[in-house]
């Protein structure tokens, strides 16, 4: 029997990134991790054993815009039903004392059916991918999700704000960095102004890569442009950009850089905030979560056509104030749930 089962959504790399931060904080021996896709490679690169059980549907992104969202919603629903079957077998075999899920609602559904204590980690309290007929289906799915959130022992949201009922707002959750910035820059050979371009765990960021390369060619500042292309982009780009591919220590690279340019995923934004690195975050158009994330910090999709000016402006600014890392609070809340269960 394993005491904690941790299910991490394999859609993108953001969930795996913050989940690794939490798992490192817990240092709990009787814990197993389940995910899929590029998240598995990420966990393995960071010497964390994780079981590859999920194959999520892919977003169809053309020129930076999300297409066929209704089709994706239908594929997600089928994926969710399949994940319930998979997680049900695992949970029945392992008989855990606690289930933690980072936006893997299939495992939470099974946990709540089996009356197993459960914690949800999530950025969102509802989805808004579709309108019309698709919106009606999505509304029903949101209602089901809301019931799960209400029934969870705790819901951890990595944002600042007040706690209410079972919702714990921890602030951004990122990995801790022990080295100082100068040490990391020296190890990475960051000798001049360095821009890091990161597009996560999917191929949705190719449009942003191409636009950034063209913008950097035109700026009047001598810079290095470093690409973190992730595991799914094999296309070759300009020789003016150094592609590090898929790395295990993106958090350190962001901390060491002078500017991070990225899609508007929550985890990369949070790393920028906690490490004090100025950022430019371009959302996938029609991707409600990324558009909401970007809007909160003053960006929109159309900014992709003004990258040159934004890059020059950001590179002349001082580094930002470093916000507090919420991983300690998240760890304490999880341990509190475990101790309460053990004392029952």
Predicted feature residues:
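C-terminal alpha-helical cap of glycosyltransferases
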Residues: 309-312, 323-344
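Conserved nucleotide-sugar phosphate-binding/catalytic loop shared by glycosyltransferases and other
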Residues: 9-10, 29-80
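Donor-nucleotide binding loops and adjacent catalytic segments primarily
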Residues: 23, 181-256
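A donor-sugar binding/catalytic signature common to diverse glycosyltransferases
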Residues: 99-103, 120, 249-292
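Conserved nucleotide-sugar donor-binding subdomain of glycosyltransferases
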Residues: 66-98, 105-106
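A nucleotide-sugar donor-handling region in carbohydrate enzymes
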Residues: 130, 135-203, 231
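Short amphipathic alpha-helix
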Residues: 15-26, 38-40
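A short, glycine/small-residue-rich beta-strand->loop->alpha-helix junction that serves as a flexible
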Residues: 8-20, 203-207
């Amino acid at each position: 029997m394993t005491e904690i089962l941790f299910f991490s959504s394999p859609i993108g790399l953001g969930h795996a990134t913050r989940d690794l931060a939490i798992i490192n904080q817990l240092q709990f021996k009787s814990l197993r991790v389940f995910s899929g896709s590029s998240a598995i490679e990420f966990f393995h690169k960071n010497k964390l054993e994780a079981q590859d059980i999920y194959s999520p549907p892919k977003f169809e992104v053309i020129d930076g815009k999300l297409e066929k969202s209704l089709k994706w919603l239908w594929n997600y629903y089928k994926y969710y039903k399949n994940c319930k079957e998979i997680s049900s077998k695992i949970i029945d075999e392992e008989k855990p004392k606690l289930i933690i899920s980072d936006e893997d609602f299939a495992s939470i559904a099974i946990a709540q059916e089996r009356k197993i204590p459960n914690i949800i980690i999530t950025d969102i309290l509802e989805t808004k991918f579709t309108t019309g007929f698709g919106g009606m289906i999505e509304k029903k799915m949101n209602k089901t999700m809301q019931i799960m959130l209400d029934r969870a022992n705790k819901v951890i949201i990595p944002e600042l704000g007040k706690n209410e009922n079972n919702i714990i707002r921890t602030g951004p959750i990122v990995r801790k960095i022990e080295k100082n910035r100068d040490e990391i820059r020296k190890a990475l050979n960051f000798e001049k102004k360095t821009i890091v371009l990161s597009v996560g765990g999917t191929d949705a960021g190719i449009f942003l890569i191409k636009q950034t390369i063209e913008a950097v060619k035109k700026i009047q500042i001598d810079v290095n442009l470093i690409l973190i292309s992730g595991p799914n982009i094999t296309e070759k780009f300009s020789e003016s950009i150094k592609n590090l591919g898929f790395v295990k220590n993106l958090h350190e690279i962001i901390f060491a850089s002078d500017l991070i340019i990225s899609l508007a995923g929550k985890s990369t934004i949070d790393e920028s905030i906690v490490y004090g690195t100025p950022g430019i975050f371009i959302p996938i158009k029609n991707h409600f979560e990324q558009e909401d994330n970007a809007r909160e910090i003053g960006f929109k999709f159309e900014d992709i056509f003004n990258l040159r000016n934004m890059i020059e402006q950001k590179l002349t600014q001082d580094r930002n104030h470093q916000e507090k890392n919420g991983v300690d609070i998240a760890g304490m809340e999880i341990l509190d749930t475990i101790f309460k269960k053990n004392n029952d």
